[in-house]
UniProtKB/Swiss-Prot annotation:
Domain ABC transporter residues, every copy: 13-228
Name the record gives this protein: Zinc import ATP-binding protein ZnuC
Topological type in the membrane: Peripheral membrane protein
Disulfide bridge map: none
Subcellular location: Cell inner membrane
Principal location class: membrane
GO biological process: response to zinc ion
Amino acid sequence: MLNFRSPETMPLVSLANAGVRRNGRWLVRGVDFSISRGEIVTLIGPNGSGKSTTAKTAIGVLKPDEGHVERLAGLKVGYVPQKLAVDWTLPLTVERLMTLTGPLKGREIEESLAATGMLHMAKAEVQHLSGGEFQRALLARAIARKPDLLVLDEPVQGVDFSGEIALYELIKQIRNRTGCGILLISHDLHIVMAETDTVVCLNGHVCCRGTPQVVSQSPEYLKLFGRRAAGALAVYSHHHDHTHLPDGRVLHADGSITESCFPGDGHHHHEEADNIHDHDPDCGCGHHARLQGYDGTEKRDA
């Protein structure tokens, strides 16, 4: 059996204090993480927090304005975009979708469609696919060239709960079979893929990081959603030592206010990845915490 998480494995991508600046404003700053073969890293955060910018910086689409990024020589990246502009008035089959980014052999198309459960839909028109089927088709296209790193930008958007579980199970199967690293982007601040090794919470900088708390620990969640969900989904709890104010400034635990927040300012010290975090009910991410209990309701502090 492959040991995907061997400490000797050289990272596919590593970011060190990386930041991107546009029009005099930092889109994201002070980002540190790495991804090795077989490892899953999930970036979470509200809209505009720098998740996609960070991912594009990691794979070389954007260059950092500070810090640095190292990538394995000859790194092959498979990418599933958050949105794909398709003219639905034009005929486009799943098979044709596979080759929009470059030519593929018939065998490569068949193998990747079969791996994502879409081989029987090869001749289907893309506009007739469900949300889950379309995401599977995009996954098939991304893995067809056997990438070292798979980047998935909001892969479960527009998919219902059961479809979300099925997609996470599929992503796990792809990782286990190929050994590729996975960088997953999600706007959901609390529910992440259970197989995630490291969760990085962004809001212009790294607010916190850690490992997900597996939902199978909660009998109430099991009762509500079943064991299949517990195997695919996990809960990530946050611990932030600061709050993002409406004007973009940052209020720190010591009462001071700064224009931004990143490790170099002397305030922010995010937790190590192996810590379990508690979530402040209004941590500044732009969302209230979904407090643990899993009774089917979302609990909010008054």
